[in-house]
Amino acid sequence: MLLSTAFFPPLSWFAAAAEDWGRTVASNPSSVCDVYLEAHENYCKQSYRNRCIIASANGLEAISVPVVHDGDIFHTPITDIRVDYEDPWVKKAKRAIESAYSTSAYFEYYKDDVFAILDSGIPTLWELNLAIINFFIKKIRLGIRIVPTTTFVIPDQIGNLPSGSTFDPVRFAHPSHCKQWAPPVHIATGGMPLEGSFQQGRYDKDYRNVIHPKKENTILEDMNLKKPYFQVFAGKYGFQSDLSVMDLLFNEGPQSLLYLVPSLV
């Protein structure tokens, strides 16, 4: 399983991350599955790496994290991207989140912890996202562990291998929707395999450029997870699918686990 980092990731991100664990947890409740996070790609703007989508009184609303632009940012490794705290984005983000979810059933229960992460001044986008992702893994009680990749995997240059191989194929078309995409400058030739053992799965387990705000995906449909849950503004806009994971947690609380992993019911 290979994913890109994301800021308050959408449900499709968490559905993909929990897929392998969901297949094993019923028979092995103590199981923990590794989910690999691409740590050696370059920064790509207009992606979930620094934005999330929530449901507000005015419809869908994007919350973005501004980053420091030093030199050629699009040839900067994702782990080196610094958050721009000179912009008052934290205040605006908290205001937007509170406005959207103050009446949801579990907002008050989780609000302080979520806002504490935003207020902590974490210097890099990578570290900020990791803190957020691990918070939701813990609160939803998912048996997954985030493991940063040790080297970059080039999407175009890895072929198919049999299921169960020590190196599973990571194969996806060149992400043309992200014009700034390029192999990191420190990668000379070819792609190196991820460490660890995988099982063959949807999209050959490479979701890095499948989950994108400007590109629809069928992950929730493929996993039979495109189903409604309570949303504050559903009466006005209808159910809105694949929003930030905070939408699920603030509205469903402890039931979020059963939504993402229905095999536990």
Name every feature range the model reports, one short phrase each.
Residues 1-265:
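Residues lining hydrophobic/aromatic ligand-binding pockets adjacent to catalytic sites
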